[in-house]
């Protein structure tokens, strides 16, 4: 079933492969204590050793700024340390948040 789901995802998104998927979500407590998390799936299964929590340096309640910071920090490190790049990045948020967070750095 996992393989079927991955094949459907590949087909719908017109991707060659989806072996590594990285997903991001932001959170805060009453507009403070901003944090963002990244979960990773490899071949459709959680890769908990690759999960990351990002403490946000900006203390404003700003989802766009938070996502920009996290995407920059994550993929700067991927490029700098020659880490495995994801086949698919999923961001929890609207189209504007995805555009603002990803398109600027990719």
Give the predicted meaning of each segment.
Residues 1-106:
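Acidic, glycine-enriched active-site microenvironments
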